[in-house]
Amino acid sequence: NMGCPVPKICKTGAGAALLADPEAAARVVEAMARAVRIPVTVKIRRGLTPSTARPVETALRLEAAGAAAICVHPRAAAEEYE
C-alpha cells in the first residue's frame, strides 16, 4: 500500500512516502515480484501533493518493475482523507 498518507507511516519512509522516490518504490515492487509466485498489486496516491502529482509516470515505472495491477487513488497524500 503505497497510498497510505498517515504521518506515522510516512515518517518511516513507507506508505505514500515512497512516492517521493519512485526508484525506491520500483525496487520494492521488483523485490516482491521476484519473491512471490502470486501477482503483486500496488495502491498509490496520485502524488505527494497536487502540484507534484505524476501518477501515470509512477504507475508505468511500477508496472515495469513487475506490478500486475495498480490502483491510483485520486487524492494526493497531502490531502489525506479530505
Ranges and model annotations:
Residues 1-82:
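Flavin-dependent oxidoreductase catalytic cores
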